[in-house]
Amino acid sequence: MAKKKFSALEISLIVLFIIVTAIAIALVTVLATKVPAVEEIKSPTPTSNSTPTSTPTSTSTPTSTSTPSPGKCPPEQGEPINERINCIPEQHPTKAICEERGCCWRPWNNTVIPWCFFADNHGYNAESITNENAGLKATLNRIPSPTLFGEDIKSVILTTQTQTGNRFRFKITDPNNKRYEVPHQFVKEETGIPAADTLYDVQVSENPFSIKVIRKSNNKVLCDTSVGPLLYSNQYLQISTRLPSEYIYGFGGHIHKRFRHDLYWKTWPIFTRDEIPGDNNHNLYGHQTFFMGIGDTSGKSYGVFLMNSNAMEVFIQPTPIITYRVTGGILDFYIFLGDTPEQVVQQYQEVHWRPAMPAYWNLGFQLSRWNYGSLDTVSEVVRRNREAGIPYDAQVTDIDYMEDHKEFTYDRVKFNGLPEFAQDLHNHGKYIIILDPAISINKRANGAEYQTYVRGNEKNVWVNESDGTTPLIGEVWPGLTVYPDFTNPQTIEWWANECNLFHQQVEYDGLWIDMNEVSSFIQGSLNLKGVLLIVLNYPPFTPGILDKVMYSKTLCMDAVQHWGKQYDVHSLYGYSMAIATEQAVERVFPNKRSFILTRSTFGGSGRHANHWLGDNTASWEQMEWSITGMLEFGIFGMPLVGATSCGFLADTTEELCRRWMQLGAFYPFSRNHNAEGYMEQDPAYFGQDSSRHYLTIRYTLLPFLYTLFYRAHMFGETVARPFLYEFYDDTNSWIEDTQFLWGPALLITPVLRPGVENVSAYIPNATWYDYETGIKRPWRKERINMYLPGDKIGLHLRGGYIIPTQEPDVTTTASRKNPLGLIVALDDNQAAKGELFWDDGESKDSIEKKMYILYTFSVSNNELVLNCTHSSYAEGTSLAFKTIKVLGLREDVRSITVGENDQQMATHTNFTFDSANKILSITALNFNLAGSFIVRWCRTFSDNEKFTCYPDVGTATEGTCTQRGCLWQPVSGLSNVPPYYFPPENNPYTLTSIQPLPTGITAELQLNPPNARIKLPSNPISTLRVGVKYHPNDMLQFKIYDAQHKRYEVPVPLNIPDTPTSSNERLYDVEIKENPFGIQVRRRSSGKLIWDSRLPGFGFNDQFIQISTRLPSNYLYGFGEVEHTAFKRDLNWHTWGMFTRDQPPGYKLNSYGFHPYYMALENEGNAHGVLLLNSNGMDVTFQPTPALTYRTIGGILDFYMFLGPTPEIATRQYHEVIGFPVMPPYWALGFQLCRYGYRNTSEIEQLYNDMVAANIPYDVQYTDINYMERQLDFTIGERFKTLPEFVDRIRKDGMKYIVILAPAISGNETQPYPAFERGIQKDVFVKWPNTNDICWPKVWPDLPNVTIDETITEDEAVNASRAHVAFPDFFRNSTLEWWAREIYDFYNEKMKFDGLWIDMNEPSSFGIQMGGKVLNECRRMMTLNYPPVFSPELRVKEGEGASISEAMCMETEHILIDGSSVLQYDVHNLYGWSQVKPTLDALQNTTGLRGIVISRSTYPTTGRWGGHWLGDNYTTWDNLEKSLIGMLELNLFGIPYIGADICGVFHDSGYPSLYFVGIQVGAFYPYPRESPTINFTRSQDPVSWMKLLLQMSKKVLEIRYTLLPYFYTQMHEAHAHGGTVIRPLMHEFFDDKETWEIYKQFLWGPAFMVTPVVEPFRTSVTGYVPKARWFDYHTGADIKLKGILHTFSAPFDTINLHVRGGYILPCQEPARNTHLSRQNYMKLIVAADDNQMAQGTLFGDDGESIDTYERGQYTSIQFNLNQTTLTSTVLANGYKNKQEMRLGSIHIWGKGTLRISNANLVYGGRKHQPPFTQEEAKETLIFDLKNMNVTLDEPIQITWS
């Protein structure tokens, strides 16, 4: 409850009262004694009403009037400053006072260090030491010395007792007069044991007296009071002790920011007080005098408890020394020794008895607030949290339910119906009410007597004034009040009766007792006479308590209770109230445990009640500090403790409350509560997800938590446990207090800072598993950066423990009926243990009466034993263990057997095993409680875990398999499982060294011949080096290479930092494993293992490298270029070869490109990408493990991993490394026509004229190699001699022209051929190694003067008519110069062109010239052309080696720019890549414009310089469908300018319908070209078809041209930032798993969805509608579908197109070509989302200049829709062309159903009223701006209403 808010008048009166009181006291003392008042307080004159009853003055030594001789001070030289014991603790020191007290005066440069400290003349001497009662007894006589506070007691008695082997007590009392002692009901006198049987020795020094307690085992001194004097006066007791270490914990209640105490001269006052916790040392609600310390890494610890309830302070200084300064009572110390910190806590709790066993429902979540205002509000909060499915057991009401805040009443107006509401709560959970101790003295609201007060008066139950008979009147919430004296047995009877009577009205279930420090809003009492009793209310020494006034905000210190004066028992008020409430609960709920929550506590309070940490504030700091408070109360024996989640005072925030609810779900006591006047903060108010999720986990773990409370009750163990209790051998754990444990086994890591998703967390030395995934974490005894996004808290299970669980529900009543389960977290020895306690959850003495079930669990040797050690709770036997999850197994599980003890084991088939994460999940068990059971699991070798060890060409037999060392197991003919596979223990390399670095890891591997018994192809490399580099936080590299010899590495430059740049925020963790060797990469956020090569089969041989990795899911995409059957890879035992080849697309046929890159989606929705930078021939095998195996025939392993976390972000990260894609010119997005086999220029000219006449959009014309003379590059044939003039003509019309170039240069010419001759001069051609001989393959060029015979076979034609050609070596500098000149000369001397199409650059060869014949053979180096044993799974011609099939010989040589040589064997797959950039450079240097290069062969980074088409496809429906897959894949690979030849290259379609669909689909390829071949296909250009098809072609192409501004903007986004243009649905909707396999639909960017028909004879198409708002592009209408499959109508002339709500698409009216369309009006399509919001951008430039973005020569405009306002913002204006920026119309889609009557346009600083039309049924609104001269290069704003 909140601190009372005083008015300004009240504050003024209080201050005035204090001043007047102080003056009065001073005057009284001066007048009465004629000496200064300060001396009188130190030595008061005894009076009948001023003497504490506990300390009669007659036993005190009078204060001396003469100053004794000063004591001896230590020499200044070498004085131990930190050992000074302060001699003036009550005020700022002065030299005069110091000398008066006989102390040493030495000022210091720091005021926290005492300037005045004790000399050796204070204290006591010990005399008459005798042995008795298992201890010593001695008289201690005061050493004559000046007094500090007067009334020093001359002689005291020391009594020691060796109570137990690990507990020692010493007590110092007044032998002559009974002083006040704490009447603790559970602390019993002990008989003690002989000193010889203890763990400690005790030494008492006599002159001066001091006592030491020494641990026998190591002679460590645990307590040494010789460091300071003993002072013992009537109202001031002081003793100091030196501590054995700096690590101490405890004392309370206060706000301690850290669990370990700060030793730097800190004062902590202890005196119970109603005070708001804050950033200070104020005394708070409790009085806890216990502390403990740890001595060393052996765990040996100690504790000290002072049994004293008087006001005191403890002073801690760095030595370390603790000084107690106490205002009364006696000194009664208990010292505990334990072998561990946990043992010390257990021993302390044994002194005052262990905590009560809570009811099971007490562990459920509770919801409360101060001042709901009415029962209706409470009901609404309950309703919404129930509806949200929040696990929630108890609703609490604060004092606002009462009538005028009177106890045992309820407000019958605001809370009318409360009894019925309580009954409803019982049907769903529990109801808790608050009770304060203060009882109003006023009548009820209706004027009736307040019977609770009346009955209390009758029984004389109140705390009285100093006369012992007059009830003391204070003030609290009800107004003027009296206070029950709970130390009086009559009061306990009255209180129990009142509780019972009220329960008869309102059936509550538990009691929350508050304000019991005890709190009063007036100082002392209404009658101020008590405050004038100086010695109690103004003692000579007042500890550093808040206000420095003993009765501040409480009762007068001379008030009388049954146990004594308030001066002595004040701090016991809450403790005694808890005892009384416990007895009341026993009456109200006979034999039930109920629930008691108290604010004020004392040692032993946990036996009676639970505690919360008080009226905290909604702040991040207080959330953090709450962990220390929780851990401290675990020390104090109050394990059911927690802070108020989300904070009590001040408005919380959503983020703070979310994070606090995550933490609060793991407080032992979990409650959300806040104060009046502040915002609501119940879980359902902020949204249920995070709160519900973690409360559900809490409820799942309640059997574990309940068992921990059983152990706390039985053995005094802690529940919320600091690290040091479990990991005391690790000094890092001694200071950790931002994380904690549940018991020994659950690690909780909360987020305690705003805006943070990465937490610096310490992971102790154990095996840990992610609770939510079961995945084993690699961390151990290290500080890590734990990724915890907004909806996550860190939860980790400790290996070696078994956690009982239960299927959760929304209340414990419901959940207790659900099946039980076990989570077994195995340790390093594959062992674990655990326990379950189960009873009815509420009976008072179920443990004492043995009415419970107790299990112990253990695992060893692959066997889990569930041993029921006690069973006397019959009702519990209906429950059963149904599930068991085992984490951290090392081997796969083949079978499970289960059985009850002494019965036959039976096979159990209901289990799954996660091989990747080694998690066994067993379901459908039926282990009823009370029985004992065994579960055994047997290891297996799953088919899915078999990695083939015979990938060679040909079929293996059992003999060849076993000879190699493989395992053999025949499989059925239908199975793809390999019959030959690696043994699981296969481990040919030993990890010999590993070196973690801040920037990565390095390691060395050594071939281990005895283990390398499997002989893989070629010779193994003996020594390998592993290098892991942490590049940016979202990317890493790991590389395996020959440590002793340089091997070929790919000479392709990547954009990676020169030095790693990652920080502790990186998204991944990497481990290098051994036995077997492997690299593991985990995503920090989920713990998911996303790369795990710790698998059999790793090999690194000279010409055979193999590595396998597990995949995190079955969702994998990429690898190419190969025709795939779907976008998602089929992992059912498929192998795909990669080696660039002149191969038309076909199933499993390696084709033109080489892309060893994949992207994987993890089951959680995260994505990552992996690139293997290797250019040698390879294949990859997928298997359903899921796993992937790479095999390559050379180079090294050089992997790059991109962590995303979304598919599109992972793709962008990959593109950033390989280079962002080239920006095509605007015209390159237009429709393009080509054909292989144009006969002459006239045929092309006729086509062009027909297309223009039909007004079909069309931008680019091509010619294939037919335009050349005999297919010779840089020539024009006779039939095309007029082609240059035709090209000039159409270019004037705005058209563009692209010509083809193949790399092969003929060497058989009889006439001058400059291209060849200059090539010879420049030495540009590929040669045989170590010679000057050119390699002479044959390709397209024909021999001169040869007649072509078209009747012979292809091979015969190659021999008869094809010329010998030389291939330029594009790696050479000289070649780049030569190529640039040939292109330049051709452009300037023969014909103009705008782009270049480079073909046949795999490179393709039809054969090799050998001895006058074309043979598919090479000169030598058979191991290169026919790699030993293994060849990747590649397409070959019969009789050919895989490497040389349609390729140059592998031993031919290339020269790199640095002059080094490489073999075709290594760089074959780079040939096309090496040609693309020189071609683009030459094109741009020649034309001065951007141009475009289209390359058939590609490799990673090709997209930086060129586009690609999908090759020589077929006119089939199958190829149409496959084109979508290829287009999506090439976007992944960084080549967004991609398309297939529309309608195919080969074969006639046979049906016009295929053309209909082909042109519809092709209109939405980024690269839209038709290019059939003459020999196999009819003309397919639009004008070659009937009029209907022509119109349909025109219609769909006009849609494309309309959208080109949007599409061009998407190409710019990819060029500037990477990412896809043609986008899979999953890239935008990755959290919707339905999208993960879709490829027959695609997106343009984020906003435009294409759903084509790709099957014959269909007039409908079924497509998925992702979870967003979608509009039909053709109509603008909202289709009102989300997240479902839907069948759309698809007539032959229509393709389904949809625009995504929330986006704005810039468009432009179409025209015959882009040159003309760019001059038409722009328009905007504004598609509103469900919130009437949308955004979009437009990128504009001149469409053809080079590097416009890089040079700032562009316009960038941002559009935003907000409800009914559309604005544009010009972000960049480096390109100005108003003609191209004219805005003609704006189309608003999804505007809403209200009719629009008014619109305003603000443009150019003026307001306009634009004309508009609307269709209310479609919710569309169209603004016509054509007559308003609006251009987009200036901002606009349109509003409508």
UniProtKB/Swiss-Prot annotation:
Keywords of this entry: Cell membrane, Disulfide bond, Glycoprotein, Glycosidase, Hydrolase, Membrane, Multifunctional enzyme, Phosphoprotein, Repeat, Signal-anchor, Sulfation, Transmembrane, Transmembrane helix
EC number(s) per entry: 3.2.1.48, 3.2.1.10
Gene3D superfamilies membership: Glycosidases, glycosyl hydrolase (family 31), Golgi alpha-mannosidase II, Spasmolytic Protein, domain 1
Positions bearing carbohydrate: 109, 464, 758, 765, 867, 910, 1240, 1308, 1345, 1359, 1373, 1485, 1513, 1575, 1762, 1829
A biological process from GO: sucrose catabolic process
Entry-annotated residues carrying Phosphoserine: 7
Record-linked CDD domains: GH31_MGAM_SI_GAA, GH31_N, Trefoil
UniProt subcellular location: Apical cell membrane
Family to which this protein belongs: Belongs to the glycosyl hydrolase 31 family.
More details: There is a high degree of homology between the isomaltase and sucrase portions (41% of amino acid identity) indicating that this protein is evolved by partial gene duplication.
Function: Plays an important role in the final stage of carbohydrate digestion. Isomaltase activity is specific for both alpha-1,4- and alpha-1,6-oligosaccharides.
Name of the protein in its database record: Sucrase-isomaltase, intestinal
Organism, scientific name: Rattus norvegicus (Rat)
